[in-house]
Structures are given as structure tokens and as C-alpha cells.
Amino acid sequence: MGIISSNKKINVDTMKCDGTARVSLAITAAPDILENPADIVLVLDRSGSMSGTPLASMKEGAKTFIDIIDEATDGNKDGQIGSGSRIGIVSFSDTATVNAPLITSVADLKSAVDSLVAGGSTNHADAFFQASQLFTIPSSSQKVIVMFTDGKTTSGSPPLPVAEAAKSSGIVIYCIGLIGSDGIDVSVLNAWASDPDATHVAVTPDAADLEELFAELAANISKTGATNIRIDEVL
């Protein structure tokens, strides 16, 4: 996910005040998901405010995400997440539930998503905690949490310390926010997510956009590259 090494060379040893020089910059991008498997936990909000269209749109988005990872890990949609990657499902309202552990079966993952029913309050802290617990078995794979929510925390402990602990343990956190009836604080999502915000947080007021946001995020996770490149030279 991003740049893992860079090297810069200049083609002269000395230079006059008005002279010019050629600077060569070599960048190595992080390998994609085929070479660098990932364990990904989709954390899905099923609180009462998600009832109706938001829940249906979230389900379609989550299933599209699963399909893209399926294809990216072995070159085709064969119903199995390949190359050592896995996906898990955690959903939350008053408390969080592990609907699917880290597995490779696309059918089982989609069944877990389809089983979700909206109702209750919004407990983000328990959602982050339960998702983090799925990574307790040692693994060399990347650890990724994708948090989807449509509103503010209304029950449970403050979620930020739990999210910070997850990041400190090596988990990368992405956030997708739907601006629901209770509103959403984007600064909170930015605080939960890994840096930089521009590539780890996406927010929309329209449930119809969710499938596209999930798809873009899946592509970002599975087909990495060098992004946000900045070159500063002072000669």
C-alpha cells in the first residue's frame, strides 16, 4: 500500500550558481495483493438508522468489495479468495457480532452480509474490538479493517482508543461514511483511520454511491501503487 523504497541520484559532483543538473528518482511501489496477501475485516453498521435503502446499498457495496478481492487474488471470480488472503465480517449495533471469521468462501461471506438486519444503537468501540480480535492468530499477511458507518457513536465506550490500539498493533484502518439522519463527524473518521486521510476515508450523503466507494476501496487495497508522490528539490 504505497511506496516501500525510493532512491535519488544527481549526475554531477559540483555545480555553478547558474548551472543545471539532472536528478533521477527511483521509486518502488508496494506489491499488490497477489504478492502481499491481506486479512481484511469488513465492519458493517446495522444500527436502526440503516433500515431500508441504506442497509440494502451497504450490502451490495460489501458484496462488490468481496467480488473484487476474489478476482484480484487469483485472476477470476471463482468463489474463493486466493493467494493466502482472507475476508471476515463483523457487524454492529448495540454490540458487535462476528458474522464470519477470516475465511476464503465468497458464498459464505455474502451469506453473512445478506443476513444483516438493522436495529439498535451504534457501538463503534465494540466493533473495532471484535474486528481486532480476528487478528490474534499470528500471520504474515497485511491486517486491514474497513469500517462502514452512517452515524455517530450512541452506545459503548469511546471508540478512538480502541482504533488507536488497533493501528499500533499494525492494523491498517479504512473508513467509509454515509451521512445518515443523525449526521456524521468526518473528523472522527479521520482520527480512526490510518494516514493519509485522502486515501483511507471516503464519505457520501447518498446511499446510491456506496457500491462505488466499496469498489474503489477494494481496488486500492488489491492493486497498490505509488501515490501522492511529491518531489522537493533545493539546489
Model-derived segments and their meaning:
Residues 6, 21-25, 88, 174, ...:
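Hydrophobic residues positioned within well-ordered beta-strands of beta-sheet architectures
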Residues 37, 84-86, 97, 142, ...:
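Exposed beta-strand and adjacent loop surfaces of beta-rich binding modules
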Residues 44-51, 63, 67-70, 80-133, ...:
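Short, charged loop segments at secondary-structure junctions
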Residues 1-41, 46-56:
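Acidic, polar low-complexity linker/tail segments
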Residues 2, 18, 33, 200-235:
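C-terminal "exit" segments of structured domains
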Residues 15, 31-34, 67-82, 132-141, ...:
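Surface-exposed acidic, glycine-flexible loop patches that form ligand/cofactor-binding
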Residues 54-57, 76, 115-133, 140-144, ...:
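VWA/integrin I-like adhesion module and closely mimicked acidic/polar interface patches used
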